[in-house]
Amino acid sequence: MGNNGVIVIKENQMLHVFTETAPTLSEAQKLVGGLVEMVRSPTDPEIQILVNEEGLLRGLPFNEEASRLCDTGIVGDAIILKGEAKWT
């Protein structure tokens, strides 16, 4: 992904790479299918992961690719932000 960027990883493993501009809250909610929760990668402080806040409660499927990239368990669709694309 380089130093900056946005990647959306659907639960079915399809990758959608965006520009270096982070999505708006409304765009993020549409991409994750509900309320957005931001989690941080436990191993890389430059990575933020936007997920569905109710993903575990709703039983969303495990997202293997997002979990691998972020080194933490992720369910449902995920938006990965890095560098200048991070939310402040």
Model regions and ranges:
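Detector for the mature cores of small, proteolytically processed
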Residues: 2-88
